[in-house]
């Protein structure tokens, strides 16, 4: 059973009851997932940007957007319009497929993994987690990478509070650390 199907059939009715909501449309849901990678060295090294674009496209299965500097900062040696990172926004089927792979395959492959921090919510029910290396994803092979780079993964939900967002992600299988 896919994560989307499990959400519709079991998670949604359970959250409706647990959060004591009156309408099925009030139940929080995942709206989008943003995978972002900032590359400080991309200003000097164009190959690192190309490698990052290829890796993120392989991991997410979607075209990558290059993020550019909004203004020049002399201290960082960047000019306006220079590429400084890349990002992917996932919605729909690809979003659910990525979330399922993240929860079931990627996170358990992290060394000394005890669960993700429950404190990484933003106050509006959205969750952000930082990944230190791209090797936790089974799509990336060790032989094809030139450097170990991390990424930020933001899960945007329709939840109004952090508690609603956490209960949604916990039902979906996100392994939260118990503090």
From Swiss-Prot:
SUPFAM superfamilies: RL5-like
GO molecular function: rRNA binding; structural constituent of ribosome; tRNA binding
Pfam families with a match to the protein in the record: Ribosomal_L5, Ribosomal_L5_C
One GO BP: translation
Gene Ontology cellular component terms for the protein in this record: ribonucleoprotein complex; ribosome
Subunit relationships: Part of the 50S ribosomal subunit; part of the 5S rRNA/L5/L18/L25 subcomplex. Contacts the 5S rRNA and the P site tRNA. Forms a bridge to the 30S subunit in the 70S ribosome.
InterPro entries registered for this protein in UniProt: Ribosomal_uL5 (IPR002132), Ribosomal_uL5_bac-type (IPR020930), Ribosomal_uL5_C (IPR031309), Ribosomal_uL5_CS (IPR020929), Ribosomal_uL5_dom_sf (IPR022803), Ribosomal_uL5_N (IPR031310)
Membrane is among the record's keywords: no
Family: Belongs to the universal ribosomal protein uL5 family.
Name of the molecule in the record: Large ribosomal subunit protein uL5
Alphabetical keyword list: Ribonucleoprotein, Ribosomal protein, RNA-binding, rRNA-binding, tRNA-binding
Lineage start: Bacteria, Bacillati, Cyanobacteriota, Cyanophyceae, Synechococcales
Record's function text: This is one of the proteins that bind and probably mediate the attachment of the 5S RNA into the large ribosomal subunit, where it forms part of the central protuberance. In the 70S ribosome it contacts protein S13 of the 30S subunit (bridge B1b), connecting the 2 subunits; this bridge is implicated in subunit movement. Contacts the P site tRNA; the 5S rRNA and some of its associated proteins might help stabilize positioning of ribosome-bound tRNAs.
